[in-house]
Every structure is written in structure tokens, then in C-alpha cells.
Regions:
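Glycine-rich phosphate-binding loop used to anchor ATP phosphates in small-molecule kinases
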Residues: 57-116
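A glycine- and Lys/Arg-enriched "phosphate-lid" helix/loop adjacent to the NTP-binding pocket
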Residues: 94-162, 172
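P-loop (Walker A) phosphate-binding loop of NTP-binding proteins
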Residues: 9
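Hydrophobic anchor at the beta1->P-loop junction of P-loop NTPases
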Residues: 6
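Pre-Walker A (Motif I) flank of P-loop NTPase domains
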Residues: 1-3
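Charged phosphate-binding loop/patch that engages nucleotide di/tri-phosphates or the phosphate backbone
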Residues: 160-186
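Conserved lysine of the Walker
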Residues: 14
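Conserved substrate/cofactor phosphate-moiety recognition/catalytic segment
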Residues: 19, 23-67
Length: 186
């Protein structure tokens, strides 16, 4: 049984790497993307999603969490290009200045619970400061936010969430380095 989830900022290579893991370890690739799970969002850019009414975003965040739970909850072996860490980080980014802390805590607790139940290995693609100037973002469908400072911010929030959740989680950091394409232990 291998249930592998990837986390990291948009355009860093999660889907590409998840497909490589799926191929090399004969695991089924499962897309966890909002665009896949919520087809009405397929043509909406990330920037436009972030401009939506905060109440609408709040409802969609819970809807996406539920859809990921339904998709991954009964699978014994898979690799996916998204994780509950992604959900937690984007929720903090979008909602922390609008929702009471107890609402944010509740959402993060749900994400942590689902991650612990449905993930054996979390691979995080970090976005350290040195990458801001030189990183070339993949964006085949022109839907991503291209501002590298935004992507760096999201990666930072993910690191903070992991710190909040504590060391009991089993995860790996996969930093952008020479080891980028080395296969993880699965």
C-alpha cells in the first residue's frame, strides 16, 4: 500500500513528478486538482478564483476538501499531484483575515486528519528564496499566477502549516536541487 501526495506551489512540477512516480512504481495517478474535481472551475484562472467573493471561496474550499476526501478515502494505492496541505495553505491565504480563528483552526484540523488517514508519504516541493529570480514556471494552460513572490508566499505558508501540525506527520521535503528527479523511497 502506497498513498503518496505531493504538495507545493503552482507550476513547480507536482503533476509531472506524480506521473513519473506513477509510471516508475506502477501506481495509479489520481488528479486532486480543483479543475479536475470541480469541472465548472476548469476554465477559471487562479487569479480569478482568488477574486471571488470570500463566502463563495469558503464554500468551494470545503467542497474541494470533501471531493478530495471522497476520491482518496477508499483508495489503497495511488499518487496524486495535490494534498490536504495545499488545501490548508490556500485556506489560510484566502480566509485567515476574514474568518474567526476557530474556523481556520477547524479547517486545518480537518486537513491534518485527512492527511494522516489517507497519506503514507507527503512529498513537498519547497520554493526557497534563491529560486525567485531564476525559476521558470510551467503553465501550459495559462491559468496560473505567474508572480514568483506569490508562489514563494504559498510555499512559506505550507512550511508554516507543517510546523503548526508538528513532527508527528510522516513527510519528506523534496527541495529543488540536483536530487530533484531522484526517485523517493516508496
Amino acid at each position: 500500500m502506497s498513498r503518496i501526495m505531493l504538495a507545493g506551489p503552482s507550476g513547480i512540477g507536482k503533476t509531472t513528478f506524480a506521473n513519473i512516480i506513477a509510471r516508475d512504481y506502477e501506481l495509479e495517478f489520481q488528479s486532486g486538482s480543483m479543475r479536475t474535481l470541480m469541472p465548472d472551475m476548469k476554465e477559471v484562472s487562479h487569479a480569478d478564483m482568488l477574486k471571488e467573493d470570500k463566502k463563495v471561496q469558503y464554500q468551494k474550499d470545503f467542497q474541494l476538501l470533501n471531493l478530495r476526501n471522497k476520491k482518496f478515502g477508499n483508495l489503497d494505492s495511488f499518487v496524486t499531484d495535490r494534498s490536504y496541505l495545499d488545501s490548508a495553505a490556500y485556506f489560510i491565504y484566502k480566509q485567515s483575515s476574514f474568518q474567526p480563528q476557530c474556523e481556520v483552526d477547524n479547517f486545518l484540523d480537518l486537513c491534518k486528519m485527512l492527511l494522516c488517514r489517507q497519506c503514507d508519504k507527503l512529498i513537498m516541493f519547497d520554493f526557497p528564496t534563491y529560486m525567485i529570480k531564476d525559476w521558470v514556471m510551467a503553465d501550459e494552460n495559462d491559468k496560473r499566477i505567474h508572480n514568483k513572490y506569490f508562489q514563494h508566499l504559498i510555499a512559506g505558508i505550507m512550511n508554516q502549516v507543517l510546523s503548526i501540525w508538528g513532527s508527528k506527520l510522516r513527510f519528506e521535503f523534496l527541495h529543488h536541487s540536483e536530487k530533484f528527479w531522484e526517485a523517493p523511497d516508496v
